[in-house]
Swiss-Prot record:
GO terms for cellular component: plasma membrane. HAMAP family: YjjB (MF_01191). The chain crosses the membrane at residues 8-28, 50-70, 87-107, 129-149. GO terms for biological process: succinate transport. Belongs to the ThrE exporter (TC 2.A.79) family. This is Probable succinate transporter subunit YjjB. Pfam families: ThrE_2 (PF12821). Its main location: membrane. It comes from Escherichia coli O157:H7 (strain EC4115 / EHEC). It is found in: Cell inner membrane. Involved in succinate export with YjjP. Both proteins are required for export. The transporter is composed of YjjB and YjjP. It is a multi-pass membrane protein. Keywords: Cell inner membrane, Cell membrane, Membrane, Transmembrane, Transmembrane helix, Transport.
Length: 157
């Protein structure tokens, strides 16, 4: 993949990630003045995850690092705009949730219950369930670590 193709794919990924970030921000009743920042943070998070995955990291670690970046930026923006950090961060990580792997695991579980046990279905179920669980864990831990670092009162050492 050339540089131009990568930059176009990155721009497309970031623009498409901004749409669900704004949508969920509107569902969560985020103030109108913060919607553009939710979109930008969703784009930054999803774009950084794509960059990390393109550079060779797996999706779980890329999601963890991207959510840490989003959490750190969200905390800084909350100080600038006098809002709670969750205003920016929660809606911004929604585009990184593992919808496809969770859906595939659920469909595999339904097929196992309808058709009976088969090894390929069980492998599909477990692989996708563990992937989805790892990504959700990476998102939650990655969002909480910047708050633990940046709001700490005692010395770090």
């Amino acid at each position: 993949m050339g540089v131009i193709e990568f930059l176009l794919a990155l721009a497309q990924d970031m623009i498409l990630a901004a749409i669900p970030a704004v949508g969920f921000a509107m569902v969560f009743n985020v103030p109108v003045r913060a919607l553009r920042w939710c979109a930008l943070l969703g784009s930054i998070g999803h774009g950084s995850r794509m960059i990390l995955m393109t550079s060779g990291l797996n999706i779980e670690w890329s999601t963890f690092m991207a959510s840490m970046l989003g959490g750190t930026i969200g905390i800084q923006w909350s100080r600038w705009y006098l809002a709670h950090p969750k205003v920016f961060t929660v809606a911004a990580v929604i585009p990184m949730f593992p919808g496809i792997s969770a859906y595939t695991a659920m469909i595999s579980a339904v097929k196992i219950s309808q058709l009976g046990y088969s090894e390929p279905l069980m492998i599909t179920l477990l692989t996708n369930f563990l992937t989805a669980s790892s990504i959700v864990g990476a998102l939650s831990i990655g969002l909480s670590i910047p708050g633990l670092w940046l709001y700490r009162k005692r010395p770090r050492v």
